[in-house]
């Protein structure tokens, strides 16, 4: 009887070894099988480990250098600045530019739209109206948009056709935008004096996807870009 028990015990141990060998080689454990202490170790590309621990940045001040050249052709003349803003705000349809620059591009396009001037010859009978403007310089922009990625001063060109019930045409914009490290005091880019009044500035900025807010010191900031 003792011999029989030893034989059964010996066969059982051999069977266990066969099972282990089979699991190790023919059917390896899953990638996250905790029995083997094996867990995924591949990096999560595109996820910044610091993003969850960043404190609220609050209001920031960004010194930028910029240039924006804007050309617009229309089927009929614009009747007002609001009319022009409504049409030109369509410049970012199917936007494929730098995502981090988009809020500041919107601000530059708003200002460039305010400064549009018509070519006199284009307003003659039979011609399609042509408008153009160009702004450039160095300014400071206050914002509460969170982390802004590095921005190199390189050009991007946007060409878009627009078509509304009342008018249609073509928009061509070339924009240079980058962060500057100048130590000089710079004038704010958001300046209500460029507009008829503060209401005009805030309402047309909404057409361009921006929310501007006035601070206690009477300076303005980009509070939201949507």
UniProtKB/Swiss-Prot annotation:
Motif mapping: dynamin binding: 2-4
Gene Ontology MF: a single term: structural constituent of virion
Pfam families assigned to the protein according to its UniProt record, in alphabetical order: Vesiculo_matrix (PF06326)
Topology in membrane: Peripheral membrane protein
Membrane among keywords: yes
CC annotations in GO: host cell cytoplasm; host cell nuclear membrane; membrane; viral envelope
Keyword Membrane on entry: yes
Renumbered ranges of motif PTAP/PSAP motif: 40-43
Subcellular location: Virion; Host endomembrane system; Host nucleus membrane; Host nucleus
Motif, PPXY motif: chain positions: 28-31
Biological process terms in GO annotation: viral budding via host ESCRT complex
PTM section of the record: Phosphorylated by host.
Keywords for the protein's UniProt record, in alphabetical order: Apoptosis, Host cytoplasm, Host membrane, Host nucleus, Host-virus interaction, Membrane, Phosphoprotein, Viral budding, Viral budding via the host ESCRT complexes, Viral matrix protein, Viral release from host cell, Virion
Protein purpose: Forms a double layer around the helical nucleocapsid, the inner matrix layer binding to the N helix and the outer matrix layer binding to the envelope glycoprotein. Plays a major role in assembly and budding of virion, by recruiting cellular partners of the ESCRT complexes that play a key role in releasing the budding particle from the host membrane. Condensates the ribonucleocapsid core during virus assembly.
Domain notes: Late-budding domains (L domains) are short sequence motifs essential for viral particle budding. They recruit proteins of the host ESCRT machinery (Endosomal Sorting Complex Required for Transport) or ESCRT-associated proteins. M contains two overlapping L domains: a PPXY motif which interacts with the WW domain 3 of NEDD4 and a PTAP/PSAP motif, which interacts with the UEV domain of TSG101.
UniProt subunit comment: Homomultimer. Interacts with viral nucleocapsid; this interaction contributes to the virion assembly. Interacts with the viral envelope glycoprotein; this interaction contributes to the virion assembly. Interacts with host RAE1-NUP98 complex. Interacts with host NEDD4 and TSG101. Interacts with host dynamin. Interacts with host NDUFAF4; the interaction inhibits viral propagation and is independent of interferon activation. Interacts with host GTF2H5; the interaction may inhibit host transcription.
UniProt family annotation: Belongs to the vesiculoviruses matrix protein family.
Protein name: Matrix protein
